[in-house]
Amino acid sequence: MNIGLLLPSHARNHPNHTAVVCEDSRLSFREFNARVNRLANALSGLGVNKGDKVATILPNCLSLLETYWAVAKMGAVVVPLSSLLREKALSALIQDSDTGTIIASPDCAAPLANIRHELRNVPGERLILTGPSHAGFQNYDELEPIQ
């Protein structure tokens, strides 16, 4: 079974049941599926395709869940990375995994900016941070789904 099909199935069959509880947020399957679809469409609009690698450098949070499910729906591959990695190791793992998109937390802005010149496979528009806007990065909350 394709894991990307599970969430839409639950959204159809149990739309009002709670899917996610994260800090003060509670989302139903319908709401969570809509958020995941929005992200999947936005990533597709940025050129992410089936089989592409999407690295995550995120804590356990709503954006991590959304990313995992969106990437699964697209048939792309999640590359989970730790925020504890030093710049050299982070660069090596991103390059060795053939990652083309990075979604990271704001505390990764400086390390990613420092290794940006080494990330040949990651176009600027696919370097995405959650939280407040940072120069040189797309803002996760401002990603636009394709129409």
Spans of features found by a protein language model:
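Conserved AMP-binding/adenylate-forming core of the ANL superfamily
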Residues: 3, 8, 16-61, 65-69, ...
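Structural core segment of the AMP-binding/adenylate-forming
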Residues: 5, 25, 45-46, 73-144
